[in-house]
């Protein structure tokens, strides 16, 4: 069989699915989490297999031992935008690096490809080289409320915080879902965040219009949460690399699948001028078409691995995730917020150790190449998913 033809057929199949999920008022405002799940097909099932390494059993960030993901999806109401009331298409996604991460910190590093956005807490990650609490993803205006939820959950787990123990600066990353969601309503509550954290699990990860991805648009199509993983051969250490993204970036002509410029082949995203007057007057989508409808968007990439890496090496992994982003067509536009955060469960950094020194296992830089390659591959596939 001709490999090029196989890839092209897979890309065509993906494009058909994408076109059925185009950003349109009817789809966006009449859908539900259940109906979205029923049409979800992952890229690999269609014949797209980015890269050379094999995925883990779940092909998800939760293939990395100990990593958990929790999500709460808020989808309520329809019709025209009523600021502060609805329609609601938003949520929160949390990644828990390991149990008791406060006392068993994970090495971490970050990379900002383009900074039109926010991921709180990065200054401390850069300074310390570790991560000591869960990561939360949500929409732009909900960052303070979600941070409050993370703090409340941490205080419940560790009552000494701020009294007999350190304080904390939560890591909360945002994308703007205001084109499909009443973002002024800031509908994600402290309770929602604590529920996502309490229900976080190490099993399969729901993708697409769930959690923080509920209102996101990517490459002019419905975007949101995606995940993928790679498991290296034993000859390369047998390590697992997992990636989770919240994709809200790119314009349709940029979308590339398997090296094929799908976005150019299948038309431009809907614009206000291409819709009927009735559509324009009855949709939340239309209300922001003249502003954020043409915005650059953002993407959050979270990378987990059990390879024993330090903060410097994990920052290097974050940079490689940007290459996976580029393989899907992104050029990290001026107005895009492209944030990468990587952590390793391969070592434990103790909380105020009694001894002045402690030991860490360290993967030599000369053996990093397979881990870097796997990061690129998993990032690309997570975005496609």
Predicted regions located by residue number:
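Bacterial N-terminal signal peptides that target proteins for export
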Residues: 2-15
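Bacterial N-terminal signal peptides
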Residues: 12-25
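Leucine-biased recognition of intrinsically disordered, low-complexity hydrophobic segments
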Residues: 8, 18-19, 29, 284
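Serine residues within intrinsically disordered or low-complexity segments
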Residues: 4, 24, 282-283
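Alpha/propeptide regions of enzymes that mature by internal proteolysis
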Residues: 29-385
């Amino acid at each position: 069989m001709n490999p090029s033809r196989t890839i092209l057929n897979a890309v065509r199949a993906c494009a058909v699915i994408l076109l059925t999920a185009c950003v349109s008022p009817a789809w966006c405002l009449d859908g539900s989490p259940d109906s979205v799940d029923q049409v979800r097909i992952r890229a690999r099932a269609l014949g797209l297999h980015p890269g050379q390494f094999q995925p883990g059993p779940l092909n998800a960030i939760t293939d990395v031992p100990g990593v958990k993901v929790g999500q709460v999806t808020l989808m309520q109401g329809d019709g025209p935008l009523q600021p502060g009331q609805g329609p609601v298409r938003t949520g929160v996604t949390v990644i828990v690096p390991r149990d008791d991460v406060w006392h068993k910190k994970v090495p971490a590093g970050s990379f900002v490809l383009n900074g039109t956005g926010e991921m709180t807490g990065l200054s401390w990650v850069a300074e310390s080289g570790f991560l000591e609490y869960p990561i939360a993803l949500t929409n732009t205006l909900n960052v303070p409320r979600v941070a409050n939820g993370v703090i409340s959950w941490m205080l419940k787990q560790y009552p000494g915080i701020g009294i007999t123990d350190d304080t904390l600066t939560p890591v909360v990353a945002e994308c703007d879902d205001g084109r499909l969601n009443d973002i002024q309503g800031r509908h994600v509550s402290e309770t929602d965040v604590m529920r996502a954290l309490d229900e976080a699990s190490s099993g399969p990860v729901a993708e697409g219009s769930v959690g923080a991805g509920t209102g996101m648009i990517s490459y002019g199509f419905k975007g949101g949460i995606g995940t993928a993983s790679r498991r290296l051969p034993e000859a390369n250490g047998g390590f697992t690399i997992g990636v989770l993204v919240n994709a809200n970036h790119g314009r349709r002509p940029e979308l590339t699948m398997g090296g094929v410029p799908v976005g150019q082949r299948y038309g431009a995203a809907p614009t206000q001028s291409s819709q009927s007057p009735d559509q324009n007057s009855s949709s939340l989508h239309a209300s922001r078409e003249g502003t954020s409808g043409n915005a650059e968007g953002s993407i959050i990439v979270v990378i987990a691995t059990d390879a024993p890496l330090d903060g410097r090496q994990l920052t290097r992994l974050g940079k490689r995730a940007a290459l996976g982003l580029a393989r899907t067509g992104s050029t990290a536009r001026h107005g895009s917020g492209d944030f990468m955060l990587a952590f390793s469960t391969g070592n434990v950094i103790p909380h105020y150790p009694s001894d002045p020194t402690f030991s860490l296992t360290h993967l030599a830089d000369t053996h990093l190449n397979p881990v870097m390659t796997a990061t690129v591959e998993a990032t690309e596939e997570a975005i496609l998913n």
